[in-house]
Amino acid sequence: MAKVESFTLDHTAVKAPYVRLITVETGAKGDKISNFDLRFVQPNENAIPTAGLHTIEHMLAGYLRDHMDGVIDCSPFGCRTGFHLIMWGEHDTTEVATALKASLNDIINASWEDVQGTDIKSCGNYRDHSLFSAQEWCKKILADGISTDPFERKVI
């Protein structure tokens, strides 16, 4: 089985919340994609409940695109401690952390009408959403401060 980078990361050494560049890969035609670890809570100490995480996912899908170009996808980790962010091109952790901070503030200030994809036609699990949970977790993440380094706190 192929080695997966995220399973080689020492989860006991990181200090969440942070943005970490996992890799930049180059395709056959020279196009580059960047993969980031957006870690919201400390691994093995906390996890965001699925309803809040699901709503954060739906809202980040729009808000991150509002704050920076090149977003391909932002998907939650199965462990519920954060997200993978896949982007076209090369970006640094400061740019991503700044856009993430703005996006989390947008979520805090949002109303239910701002949440996209919350009905049976637009979501595969539309019953599992909580804007209240999403907003409370976003407040905590921002209060803890988003670092541009996973091992040393460099809060933006």
UniProtKB/Swiss-Prot annotation:
Q: Name one GO molecular function term.
A: iron ion binding
- If you read the UniProt record, what top EC class would you report for this enzyme, in one word? lyase
The record's annotation in SUPFAM superfamilies points to: LuxS/MPP-like metallohydrolase
Give the protein's cofactors: Fe cation
Cofactor note as given: Binds 1 Fe cation per subunit.
- InterPro entries, alphabetically? LuxS_sf, Metalloenz_LuxS/M16, S-ribosylhomocysteinase
Instruction: Please identify the protein, giving its name as recorded.
Output: S-ribosylhomocysteine lyase
Q: Which organism is it from?
A: Ligilactobacillus salivarius (strain UCC118) (Lactobacillus salivarius)
Q: Which gene encodes it?
A: luxS
